[in-house]
Amino acid sequence: MYGNEEAVGEGVRRGMEAYGIPREDIFVITKIYPSQFSEPEAAIDMALQKLDIGYIDMMLLHHPGANDVKAYKVMEQYVEAGKIHSLGLSNWYVEELTEFLPQVDITPALVQNEIHPYYQEQDVVPFIQNQGVVVQCWYPLGGRGYTSELLGNDTLKTIAASHGVSAAQVILRWDLQRGIVVIPGSSNPEHIRENLDLFGFQLRSCA
């Protein structure tokens, strides 16, 4: 879907060669998509070929769909073969997980969902965490047209000012204090540094 596996693989190989970075210090996540669930072996083999980095650290099912259990069970076989090291899900919620989890052998290590202050997932997050599964959020800063609105929210700006940080840092810290892994994206070096600088303040309540 994203069409970047070849570029990611090339970047990993270059980094390993140029800087001596061990492969085990790099963690690559990729996905297979509902349109590929009927032929998961072909999708996984293609991902392995395009990445060309020996193995995939984690593979996710991108969204529930027909043959999702079948696809996941094939992914389990690749784990047994050492070609995939861990498995996860994306866009799975309480109802879908309740039906899905009893049908598979390897509990997903991670569930990746959209989570931000306008989409808080107050019921889903604890449900997933109570299964012993890590929650990761995509679009933590709003996404889908909400980023500017979210970062300009008066309440968030007030909280940010009280801590001497940005609204984006408040949002990311809120996620971290809920035990959620965040994956903000940016090509702006200043924003990247800001997104990493989350540990010098504490929010009072993150329920």
Label every model-predicted segment.
Residues 7-17, 44-48, 75-76, 97:
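Short, well-ordered amphipathic alpha-helices
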